[in-house]
Every structure is written in structure tokens, then in C-alpha cells.
Curated annotation (Swiss-Prot):
Protein's recorded name: UPF0229 protein BA_0551/GBAA_0551/BAS0519
Disordered, as annotated region: 1-31, 80-117
NCBIfam families given in the database record: spore_yhbH
InterPro entries assigned: Spore_YhbH (IPR014230), UPF0229 (IPR006698)
Compositional bias segments (type: Polar residues): 1-16
Ranges of biased composition (kind: Basic and acidic residues): 21-31
Amino acid sequence: MGEENQPNYTISQENWSLHRKGYDDQQRHQEKVQEAIKNNLPDLVTEESIVMSNGKDVVKIPIRSLDEYKIRYNYDKNKHVGQGNGDSKVGDVVARDGSGGQKQKGPGKGQGAGDAAGEDYYEAEVSILELEQAFFKELELPNLKRKEMDENRIEHVEFNDIRKTGLWGNIDKKRTMISAYKRNAMRGKASFHPIHQEDLKFRTWNEVLKPDSKAVVLAMMDTSGSMGIWEKYMARSFFFWMTRFLRTKYETVDIEFIAHHTEAKVVPEEEFFSKGESGGTICSSVYKKALELIDNKYSPDRYNIYPFHFSDGDNLTSDNARCVKLVEELMKKCNMFGYGEVNQYNRHSTLMSAYKNIKDENFRYYILKQKADVFHAMKSFFREESGEKMA
């Protein structure tokens, strides 16, 4: 074979699966991180360091380390064919210790000193963005409707086209190789080499204009003297995540913050999350303020309206009937009304007793008794609807 006919490439015959070990380990690590986020999410969402942060911090969560393959001494000295029932996963501990059937103290968890090895854990840093992705993926504004007077449009970029020219960073390797295989196969060559210019395929984006309805969320919080430090923290934790959820998933959602004791007033967001007040409780005042806002600023013909009220349920008894009437009036103009009650010790609530008589399906309530209930309240209020979504 002449020098000019010598191939300018070689094909390696080594085991390429060995080169993927680092990638496989990285994938296993990411799976463990996502599993840890999912398992710890109800507790993580109420971490004070997150709720009181600027939204850019990271948190640390414990993750079980993966056991690498190792040779262990066979204490039982028995012959074995295999292990397990087929449910084992990479990294699971499969060896037995040399107890000889005797009872052991265990790995040192709880009281007393154990004598067995424990599970290795390490702390992984997780950004709030990763928490949001895990938390918000199954949440949506319920009963979102198209409004007749709505003319909003959202520009959305979608990679939905394949072209023969484009940026090298957007080259579609799979389609390029398939194209080369087809061309070479027609010439009797069972390979994708060489790749010609005509084989190149590039992913290309198009700008898509999607109609989008306006929505407004009325965040109403009881700041009276009966709302202690823990109650206010729970309410603010809910509204913290609600605000981030709305601003992450929806581009045209307004949020109005209303604080109340015996009187209600619209306050800036920073004051809503930081300022404490005292005094008695007349919840009807905040519903009147909400109706006033709707009448003056947010017409139901143009806006999807979602009021959310958080309180400890300790309302002036004579005001409860008025509250029920105003809530029913609000629901005629709103897509959904959400009431969250922070009631750690399961005490009698005059307000909840009145609200339980409301039978409207668009009225949702949730009683929060522990920190993890902030997560469950979000899932309850913003759960995905089984019916048709807004077109």
C-alpha cells in the first residue's frame, strides 16, 4: 500500500467503558444529591438560613456515601453463588460481619457504645436554585383561565428545528453521525468516517410567542399580638416560597402584600417580611382591603385573582360571621381562596370553626402544626389540576 493510501486515523480496541468511570461516579453522586433533596425537602424549605437569606445562598444536606467494591473476609466460610434478591443497587453494603450469630450492640446510634461500623455521611452543598427546581416542578396556579381582555404575549425560545448550518456549539452530534452513516452505507462503507460538510446538522431555536393571562396574588398576613414569633415565622416562610414560586414560573403575576391587625393596609414587600406589630385581631378588615384592591385595580375580567390569608385563627368572635360573608364575596371574583392557619397545639380556633361551613370547592385551607407543614401547604394550595390546563 502506497504512502498516500495510508489511513490517517486508527481505531482503538481498548475497553472504552473504563473511561466512563468518572462520569458514572458523577452520575451516581448527582442521583444521591437529588434523592437527599427530595427526602429532606419538607425540612429544608423552613430552614431559617434560607428564609432569611437573599435567595442566593447554599445549604448543606447530609448524603450517604457510596461504598466502593472491596474484598472482604468470608467469616462464615461458606460457598456462595450470588447475593440478594435482585434489588441491590450500586454502593449497597452486601457483606456480613463475623458475629457468628451473636447479638451485637450496633453501629453506635442512640444510647450506649456500639461496636459495629456505621454509615458514612458527608454534607453536600445545594443551592437554593436546586431546591426550587425540586420544589416547584409539581406546582401551578390552580384554575388559571384565559381572560377575554388579555393581550399579553410571552416570547419563548424553543430548540425545535434542525438545519445544515449554525453555531458549532449547537451541533447535533447524533444526527450528524447518522447522516454520515447513511451516506457511507450507500457507498458500501460500514462506518461514519469521514464526515463531510453535507452531513453536519445543527440544532436551531425559534422564538415562539405564547399568549399569557395576567394574575394577581393577594398575600394577606395577620400581624396582631396573638401571632407570636413562631406563628409569624411560619406565615412568612410560606409567603417567601410562594413569592419565589410565582416569580420563577410566571412572568405576568403581580403580588400585593397586605398586613392586618384590627386594621389592614398594603405594605412594601420588605416590610411585610420583617416588620412586627401588635394589637387585636379583626380579620374582616383584610378582606375588605382585598375587595377594595380588586375593585380599584384588578378587574376580574382582566386578572386571575388568588387571595391567600395566614392567621393563627384567634379572631374576634363577633367578626367571624362577617369574615365568612366577605370570603364568599371574594370567591365570586377570584379563581381560588386559600386560608392557612398556624395552630401548633391544636387549640380551638374560632375562625376555622366558621370557615369549615364553607362548601365552595374553590375554598382551600390548611392547618400548619410543624415546620414541615409549610411544604405540605404549598403542595395543597398549588397542586396540579387533573383537568385541562389553560390553552
